Regions:
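Short glycine/proline- and acidic residue-enriched helix-loop micro-motifs
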Residues: 37-40, 99-109, 161-167
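A gly/proline- and charged-residue-enriched helix-loop-helix capping module
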Residues: 89-127
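Short, flexible, mixed-charge acidic loops at enzyme active sites
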Residues: 82-95, 147-158
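Metal- and O2-centered redox machinery and metal/ROS homeostasis
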Residues: 1-14, 109-112, 183, 188, ...
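N-terminal basic, low-complexity leaders that serve as flexible interaction/assembly modules and, when applicable
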Residues: 1-86, 127, 213, 217-218
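A short acidic, glycine/proline-enriched capping/turn motif at secondary-structure boundaries
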Residues: 73-76, 91, 101, 141-143
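Active-site loop segments of alpha/beta catalytic cores
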Residues: 113-274
Length: 274
């Protein structure tokens, strides 16, 4: 467990913040490139020992404070029966519609397909020094919905926005599986699990608060103080909900270069993860 990382989650002032690689290993890291030359991306994710080797690269080369599970946020969609390959970008076998929503596998059938992530966390934790922390991650509900509907996250997400009435019934199937996915990673030794919601900023604050926040609350209530949350491109108006306030159930929030850190410190009294 890394002291600097724990201090950041507890909002304890410190001279040096914790450092970790946002992109797991870093696509431009020579250690990653050498492994990628020998193995497919899918193989690197699904072989627990390989995934641990990738995750350890930044720790061994730069002595960072925190490692993060090497994986991909789309694996829950694969587990739900949507198919997945990388050629080189991710490609799903089919896209979500009102007609095929019923074809998605439920959590009890899908969960075994995510067991490899728990094993990858276990292998990474074995290799990490005790002074380092370990983060797991899953995709945020809206981001997974976007990929399910469109097959990619690009542009203004017009198709996802038109399909927003599908979001709630999709979450009724997705969230039980995400809870199992998060639990697997925590059981494997992750200190917290990040929710990466890279599509969230494409929605207006009103639409985000009305549709996305209820799904986030369900996850946060299931794992109080065990989840971090980063939503790309959101504005202060997106986070005007008690979920992001002083008594937030999240372990910490992530903020990017679009934010004035003075606003983040003023409006959000909980911990910080990035």
């Amino acid at each position: 467990m890394n002291v600097r990382f724990q201090n950041a989650l507890k909002r304890i002032p410190q001279a040096v913040p914790p450092v970790w690689f946002m992109r797991q290993a870093g696509r431009y890291h020579k250690h990653y490139q050498a492994l990628r030359a020998k193995h497919s991306f899918m193989e690197m994710c699904k072989d627990p020992k390989l995934a641990a080797e990738v995750a350890m690269g930044p720790i061994e080369d730069f002595d960072f404070d925190v490692a993060i599970l090497f994986s991909d946020l789309l694996f829950p969609l694969e587990a739900m029966g949507m198919g997945l390959k990388y050629d080189p970008a991710p490609q799903l076998g089919w896209h979500l519609t009102e007609e095929n929503l019923k074809d998605l596998k439920r959590w009890d059938e899908a969960k075994p397909a995510l067991e490899f992530q728990k094993q990858a966390v276990i292998e990474t934790r074995k290799r990490l020094p005790e002074s380092k922390s370990l983060i797991g991650f899953v995709g945020g509900p809206l981001t997974l919905f976007t990929y399910a509907v469109e097959g990619a996250h690009k542009g203004g997400l017009e198709k996802s926005k038109r399909s927003l009435p599908l979001f709630k019934p999709f979450c009724e199937i997705l969230l039980p599986l995400l809870k199992e996915n998060i639990q697997l990673q925590l059981e494997g030794g992750a200190e917290i699990v990040m929710l990466f919601d890279t599509a969230a900023g494409e929605l207006s604050p009103r639409v985000y608060l009305e549709n996305v926040v209820p799904a986030l609350k369900e996850l946060a209530q299931a794992f109080p103080k065990k989840l971090g949350y980063y939503a790309k491109g959101v504005l202060p108006a997106h986070l005007r909900d008690e979920l992001f306030g002083e008594d937030s159930l999240f372990a910490g929030l992530g903020f990017d270069h679009r934010w004035d850190l003075r606003d983040a410190f003023r409006d959000h009294r909980g911990g910080f993860v990035q």
